[in-house]
Amino acid sequence: SGDTTIIFKIYNFLKEKGVNVDICGANEEANYDDYDIVHLFDIKNIFDAYKHFKLASNSKCNIVVSPMYFNMEKFFQYSDNVERNNLWNNCKAYRELILKKSKIIFCNSIYEKSLITKDFITKGEIKVVYNGVDINYDEVPLYNFKERYNLDNYILCVGRICDIKNQLELSKVCNELGIDLVLIGTTSEESYLKECLSYSTTHYLGFMNDYDLYNAYTFSNAHVLASFSEVTSLSSLKAAAYGCNIVVTEEGASKEYFKDMAIYCDPYNHNSIKSAVEKSKVKRKNNKLKEYIRYNYNLKNMLEGIYEGYLKLMN
């Protein structure tokens, strides 16, 4: 997932800087007194972060957090899921406690910063550090992705397969338009994936490594993510950096990142998604968005921004 990718990129960057750094998984514990900084990630799914927060807050370390926050209330109400909506609201106090106790809150957009200050009371510095992606395969030969998977023109969607990412609606749209949809990513919602695959034009290729994704992006008509919840999508950034046309959700910080260079859709509106996919089929690829993303949202900028925050805290 996106947060795991970011965690490992930060870990490797700090190792190269000679910093002693460890990753502590959801079900692991550490002696937090051994650390100057504990960096927590993702307060949407609060339980893992809160467990580490409780233990770390009793030690002498500095706590910082990357909230990866998006208010899910609208989606839970739309999907008529009272139980999930109640749980979301009941956990607000735990999210706020983490944010209040954090010395730095790393937001990945001005949008997320404004959402945090609107929904919570905070005390520490809020520092905007935009997400970034690395480009690894520009000089590496492609293989013919269409040939390997027996595809013609196709729409690509990379990300966890689940109701929040809205691949089912995208499957319906692509089926109506008679265009192949390729889904790549892990899933913990098998029944949801099965519904997507009930449409003959939807193809699921499972998890893929970066090199295979590079080929998938390069040969696709467009990358589409009509998600209900997206502060910003690493897969959309990566797709854009490899030269894809992209269709992205209106929700979240999409317009802050992609300006007028993406095609936008309303995830709550079938016809909006359909219209956006149709536009992406005929839009010619150009390098404007590709170069813009590579310059402004590269991995180096993101890692340096987080490292600067750490250094400021230590000094």
Predicted ranges, named:
Residues 4, 180-205, 212:
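Short, structured helix-loop element that forms part of the nucleotide-activated donor/catalytic region
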Residues 2, 282-314:
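A charged, aromatic-enriched C-terminal amphipathic alpha-helix characteristic of glycosyltransferases
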Residues 146-165, 171-176, 182:
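Conserved donor-binding/catalytic core segment of Leloir-type glycosyltransferases
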Residues 228:
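Aromatic "clamp/platform" in nucleotide-sugar-dependent glycosyltransferases that forms part
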Residues 262-270, 277-283:
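Conserved acidic donor-binding segment of nucleotide-sugar-dependent glycosyltransferases
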Residues 71, 85-105:
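Membrane-proximal helix-turn-helix segments that form the acceptor-binding/catalytic region
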Residues 245-248:
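Short hydrophobic beta-strand element within catalytic cores of glycosyltransferases
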Residues 111, 132:
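Carbohydrate-associated surface elements
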